[in-house]
């Protein structure tokens, strides 16, 4: 006999109540929007900019080394919220030892919601329904620590209902975009009629600092990361107005064993700091296939094998070296990571927002290629971050992508 509960004089079957509260179909990506600050710096000019604003032009050998690093990043340009004028007004930002976290957080408290809102407005416009129809809001950032936070600020900025159900995620690093979408899938599938707005926004101002002759990590971070925000609307059981792009078939997360030393972050009185170890690409290359098989093997029909090339790929472009490792480990054909490499080239690594940029670029490339021939219907969206954590989802591309 099915469990029941008594409400007043009526008897309600709990199983029927639960089914009525859940969506019938899979959660899907219904719209995507992205945004960047207006300040664009090319990779070619960045070493001169960086050493000038940090008063480090006298470190000629280190500057030459940094130029070589920038040339090997696979990055052509990046967008930055911080400008030369801002850094001149805040000399503590370029002093590696000066306490400056409060000033950075105060700037981020306004800049992050504004950038996030710009991306979200684009997603809502593409979606085609009123902002007031958003039922849930999931926001993720590494750039801030104010409460009320970015999620709260977005309610009036976007015209969301005061009753929108908000969730704020902090310090998930580069896997944050996938983690937020994974949460959105659960919300959409377990709440009939839910429409979840996911926003990831990042500012490199949180960890900008001057060069250190004894710290290669500083040069790597300053030459790789950029600023950006990405927004996605997720929902199940699309109505006649909505055009689902990617159904989220499955979502999973796992940890690479004995890797927590390789990549981590923490707030100090100076800035957001952490460890970005040289072993990160190798750890990903050695473990990515096993992680994917553990997460999606049964859904993909077993052991992967050459089947990895039968999928499309939206991989977080943490660096060109990381993508080279993924290519090699999975035996991917040339061009399989073209969307991710394009995003790295055009924007740099924007932490949690980057993988959503890659998904957006992938749908553009799919639209261009659809008329030319076959394109896989199934694909993987995947990101890596502190832990080390691998967060991924199996996607099904709908006809609306074309």
Swiss-Prot record:
GO BP: flavonoid biosynthetic process; polyketide biosynthetic process
Biological or metabolic pathway of the protein: Secondary metabolite biosynthesis; flavonoid biosynthesis
Domain of life: Eukaryota
SUPFAM superfamilies referenced in this protein's UniProt entry, alphabetically: Thiolase-like (SSF53901)
Active-site positions on this chain: 174 (acyl-thioester intermediate)
Record bears the keyword Metal-binding: no
Gene3D superfamilies associated with the record: 3.40.47.10
Effect of residue 265 to L: Loss of the bisdemethoxycurcumin-forming activity and formation of bisnoryangonin
EC number: 2.3.1.211
Family matches, as InterPro entries: Chalcone/stilbene_synt_C, Chalcone/stilbene_synt_N, Polyketide_synthase_type-III, Thiolase-like
Function description: Plant-specific type III polyketide synthase (PKS) that catalyzes the one-pot formation of the C6-C7-C6 diarylheptanoid scaffold of bisdemethoxycurcumin by the condensation of two molecules of 4-coumaroyl-CoA and one molecule of malonyl-CoA.
Family affiliation: Belongs to the thiolase-like superfamily. Chalcone/stilbene synthases family.
Stated name of the protein: Bisdemethoxycurcumin synthase
Species lineage: Eukaryota, Viridiplantae, Streptophyta, Embryophyta, Tracheophyta
